[in-house]
Amino acid sequence: MTTISTTTASSSSSSRGRVFHRRTHQSRRRLLRTTEVVQAQTSSSNDAMEEETFDVVIIGSGIGGLSAAALLAKYDLKVCCVESHEHAGGAAHEWKRDGFTFESGPSLYTGLSQFPTSNPLGQILHAIDEPLKCIRYNTWKVHFPEATFVTEVGNDQFIECLEKYYDAEAVADWRKLKEKMEPLAQASAALPPAAVRTDAYAAWTLARFIPGLFQSMPSLNAILSDYESFLDKNDINSKFIRDYMDLLCFLLSGGTSKATMGAEIGYMFADWYAPNAALEFPIGGSGALVDCLVRGFEKYGGDLRLRTHCEEILVEKKDGEEEEATGIVTKTRDGKKKILRARKAVISNATIWDTEALLRDCAEGRRQSVREASSTTRTTKSGKIVDDDVEFCQSFMHLHLGIDAANLPAAETLEMHHVWVGDWDKGVDAEQNLVLVSIPSIKDPSMAPEGKHVIHAYTPGNEPLARWKNVKYNSEEYSKLKKERSEVLYQAVAKALNNITVEDLRSRAEIEMVGTPVTHARFLRRGNSQGTYGGTGWIKKKESGDDSAAAVPVTSAKSNLKNLLLVGDSRFPGPGLPAVAAGGWAAAHELVDFRRQCEVLDKVVAR
């Protein structure tokens, strides 16, 4: 699951060896965007804005943007990726302070280091020849209303937990679910995102997967529908198993089973509950993952520009044809502006709502179409049009701690990952009812100084945006609300540390940082999207009497504006590392020859 940065990351000005581009720009007059005026600007060197030209310009270095960037550079395109922050990685970046390494986002990883893998992000790492060193493990601890216990992935130990803490119905339903999930998991992996393209040449890239697709036909409807319908159809009635699957869906997609596509949970189930499956943790944290993508991008000639903000997406009409994206205007922290032209495409890793705001001189209808292209539409038998609009996910509260571990239990007796649920009846998406705790220094001691632990606790996408909408950053109201809303995080961390008191935990804290939806909006440039975790709403359980076909969103980077592609957590399939990496594959394969795509498929997909 990918979470969102909530800190300034100001503790380290290091950028892992990146070069900040601080070229001298000439002053500019008001930017006019028609082709004729851009040509006229060159008549005055004092008035003209400096320009550079690339094949592709990418806005934002989140995992979706970096995935597309690294793949396109691998395909020999000239690519520039601009990032407002001083660190690459977007919601997955990390920063250091006083020897502690803090992760802003992801905490649970699978399928990144082994080969073959069904994880689209793991496949990208293989494609660009950037292996990621990971620690493999298989346990996590849950703190549920009924019981607290350690459970495992990759075997049947969960059955033992069900037998000990729950009832016979839960055991029977879990056994049944594992059996029913096997064909769903196989169907979910039958067509990797790396094979998809939207032109006629898809016949070539998809050909090798046709046999697997035919074998998966009986499960096709299930992978394209909401997962709750799958549970209903297979008579999974145990309240705990239904609650538990809601939890897994929410951690995966930001929605419960009624709002999660069967294919998504199929991928996850294959990764977690296949024999000998394991969780992974990148040595060095999420920053090591980001570094792999950046190294791959740069070694193939990519140009990453940090501290470089996109002010605007340029939209022009050429020769009287339809509007198209032709480049961007950037602004560095010293106030200098530059035009970066794109021969083939502009790719935005900003949210669809924040991308819309960058289309300043685009026709109103075109601006709206950026958002509408991310929705799904279906038609009922009676001819009624039903729009399933993309919606905001809620946001996060985050707690980052660097603590003194003196007299705490030894690291080998503690678990790295903890999940706390307050009340199943409220629902896992209820505010303040679900907390995740990650203590990465338990598995990777390099994440904290000797004798210390680094901790990240967060409410994963269930903090209401509306509660923070009109709260001013650093106001008295903000400080009070931040303290109030972070209390549940302290309580969950205290439980994770073998039930120490909150007072003991606070006394151990050497570094303490609390993040809110407001810090999401500020540091991830999500002002128009209010600090959201990403998008949701593409998968909706049909209401009684709705005779429409299921709305089937497709992993596509296309927008309704020519040469503007969209990636990231506000596009289907939504938040999460595998999901946004799938968007990176989709964007890259809108722009490259199918024969090059087939070469990469030979490399990353096991036959």
Predicted regions and their residues:
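Mid-domain catalytic core of redox enzymes
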Residues: 281-282, 302, 308-449, 558
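N-terminal chloroplast transit peptides
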Residues: 1-27
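N-terminal glycine-rich phosphate/pyrophosphate-binding loop and immediately adjacent elements
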Residues: 48-193
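Rossmann-like flavin
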Residues: 145-260
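Short beta-strand to alpha-helix junction loop
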Residues: 215-226, 273-299, 305-307, 477-485
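C-terminal segments that line or cap access tunnels to active or ligand-binding sites in enzymes
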Residues: 404-515
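A glycine-rich dinucleotide-binding beta-alpha-beta segment and adjacent secondary-structure elements
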Residues: 241-257, 436, 498-573
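A conserved FAD-binding loop/helix module that cradles the flavin
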Residues: 106, 569-592
